[in-house]
Amino acid sequence: MGIEEKAGNLGIVTTTLETVVNWGRTNAMWPLLFGLACCAIEMMGAQASNYDLSRFGMELNRASPRQADLMIVAGRVSRKMAPVVRRLYDQMPEPKWVIAMGDCAACGGIFNNYAIVQGVDEVVPVDVYVAGCPPRPEALIDGIMMLHQKVMREKISGKKESPIRIDQPLVQVK
Amino acid sequence: MDNQTVLAALRERFAAEILAVNEFRGDLSLTFTPKGYLAAAQFLRDDPDLAYTFLENLCGVDYLGRKPRFEVVAHLTSMRHRHRVCLKVGCDEPEPTVPSLTPLFPTANYQERETFDLLGIRFDGHPSLTRILLPDDWVGHPLRKDHPLGDEEIAFTFNQERIYARKPFVRE
Amino acid sequence: MTEPITVPTPQQIIEPAVAGRTETMVLNMGPHHPSTHGVLRLVLELDGEVVVNVAPDVGYLHTGIEKTMESKTYQKAVVLTDRMDYLAPLSNNLCYALAVEKLLDVEIPERAQIARVLLTELQRISSHLVWLGTHALDLAAMSVFLYAFREREQILDIFELVSGARMMTSYFRIGGLAYDLPSDFIPTVEQFLAVMPSRIDEYEDLLTANPLWLERTVGVGVIDAQSAIALGLTGANLRATGVAYDVRKAMPYSGYETYSFEIPVGKNGDIYDRYRVRIAEMRQSVKIVQQATERLRELGPGPVVTSNRKVAPPPKREITESMESLIHHFKLWTEGFKPPRGDAYVSIESPRGILGCYVVSDGSPKPWRVHFRAPSFINLQSLAHMAKGRMVADLVALIASLDPVLGEVDR
């Protein structure tokens, strides 16, 4: 993060800088072309013309992790594939974010067995989880919007915010 | 071509090798000795009248609690006659081994490797019997009945704290 | 068949290189590469740009579906079948349902049969559209990808109308369909049929006589019929070599013998012929969907699950009236139906090739063994045979034309 961190807390100057930097990051986040299984097809559907992802600046799917900043883990991660996922994540330069798309990436999905890693957050740190099997393209876009909001809240110090836990049930039953 | 014709042709040549004949829901399946299995497959493929040139499916089944414990099932199809016949051969622990159909039908290559990988059945005469679906250093054969499913306890609100404390989450 | 058929493994290519062979280079086309066919790893042995040998390394998507199905009842295991060949989930559902129905020996009502044929053919069209889009994308014809997905969205809307889910519908259950067809199903399908043949003409306009496309695909990746049968190559890949074998005509299921359609057959067995065969298959599928729609309209409303109450549950309102229905419902929900001891194998023509399902039952509510004969897994064996002597760019086109789906390869 360089100069912004060294400039310290200069009040209004750093706040505006934060906003500008985060705005720049959200509006042209390049995803890594990383489709594993069925969710990849819905990701392709989200990229296609009906649920266009290029209006969010994500038209270019970079094949090389060195040129990408968002890894959408779309699909089930098997035990053979887990080291590959980790290696690709390590090869991505900072700043980088990870969206776990689909139930298999979030928690292992319907495959609770020897072959599938129960949630890709055992392999890479995840920022946003998108539920669904597979999630509709609109759900993926909702996840991407949530990630954009999370990025907009990022501070210059570079410290990652702690995950927002929902402790109370979402529906209050009286 | 129907079940009776092919059964008669096989009985003529391999009567000693046929251990069982079963016709269930219109499908003919024969259980052979290992020697008969290979010879019958070759005969069915090469005989000009029968022409079962297409090996459609080859897989293994683990009948835990039965002797022989494992069984390899091969479905041969004749495209000309539009008919299918099933050859079965049993093999037992400790080292289940069955003749390989790969020299006769190259399509059996991956299917036998998969059966070896998941069930541990060895195939004599296979050019390269190695693991295919699981990582090379995996120990065990998952599809065997005595291999556990490997499932994780499902997290509900009452036990999630305990489960998540032990799960190897990655933080950076 | 001039040279002997070999299916190399990655170790067979890597070990001599490690031991010191320097005439050829070993290159890894890793599990992550910019081709949307999934996590397939290829180990290439190259002499400059020319491929001397290629060995697929699969297993990066192994999900243990067959083992997991053994721990679920028959009906619950249907959802796992969707996720194998994820471009044609309804085909997987159909294959598994047919295999278990063969074990159970149940009658499926006419309305369900026609709906199964209709939706399976729509699924075939949508799968071929993804194939076309990704194949063209691999060869840098990007507009076709966007056009194909436009039609696919229409088909996915139909699936959503019928089952609630766009892709993993699990709509074909053992005994019939999950729910009855909604009232606006036939008009929606007819709306789709109104546009479809002209859209296929659009794709053909872009590609079939395009000199760039012809340059990349004609004469590339040739395989002859005898090698194809020996290697177990099925589907459009086999029909492109001249063998007119389609399970829908050879061993018909679900009433396919009553529909009139043709089997497109190629001549040379190269990538261009596979392309032509699949485009023609899309047209034939449209024809079948038209016939099925007319039949549905004529048949009118009716039951969509078998009347055998030991297999399919009774309608909910009967439970309050009849003790027998209540008991059937209870047994089905707590235990599940129990097929007789035995085994059954059924194969269908999925968009990838011959998809087979081998089910073994031991008389309990859970299957003893389920095995899927996955066409993509077996088709991959022919890659080395077809790619020898071609260049790496041809290999990309070759994989796309084989149309593998890694979910099915690894199960």
UniProtKB/Swiss-Prot annotation, chain A:
It is an enzyme of class 7 (translocase). Keywords: 4Fe-4S, Cell membrane, Iron, Iron-sulfur, Membrane, Metal-binding, NAD, Quinone, Translocase, Transport, Ubiquinone. Binds 1 [4Fe-4S] cluster. Disulfide bonds: none annotated. [4Fe-4S] cluster binds at C38, C39, C104, C133. Its cofactor is [4Fe-4S] cluster. GO terms for molecular function: 4 iron, 4 sulfur cluster binding; iron ion binding; NADH dehydrogenase (ubiquinone) activity; NADH:ubiquinone reductase (non-electrogenic) activity; quinone binding. This is NADH-quinone oxidoreductase subunit B 2. The lineage of its organism: Bacteria, Bacillati, Chloroflexota, Chloroflexia, Chloroflexales.
UniProtKB/Swiss-Prot annotation, chain C:
It is an enzyme of class 7 (translocase). NDH-1 is composed of 14 different subunits. Subunits NuoB, C, D, E, F, and G constitute the peripheral sector of the complex. Transmembrane segments: none annotated. Its EC number is 7.1.1.-. Belongs to the complex I 49 kDa subunit family. It catalyses: a quinone + NADH + 5 H(+)(in) = a quinol + NAD(+) + 4 H(+)(out). It is a peripheral membrane protein. GO terms for cellular component: plasma membrane. NCBIfam families: NuoD, PRK06075.1. Pfam families: Complex1_49kDa. It is found in: Cell membrane. InterPro entries: NADH_Q_OxRdtase_suD, NADH_UbQ_OxRdtase_49kDa_CS, NDH1_su_D/H, NiFe-Hase_large. NDH-1 shuttles electrons from NADH, via FMN and iron-sulfur (Fe-S) centers, to quinones in the respiratory chain. The immediate electron acceptor for the enzyme in this species is believed to be ubiquinone. Couples the redox reaction to proton translocation (for every two electrons transferred, four hydrogen ions are translocated across the cytoplasmic membrane), and thus conserves the redox energy in a proton gradient. Keywords: Cell membrane, Membrane, NAD, Quinone, Translocase, Transport, Ubiquinone. This is NADH-quinone oxidoreductase subunit D 2. GO terms for molecular function: NAD binding; NADH:ubiquinone reductase (non-electrogenic) activity; quinone binding.
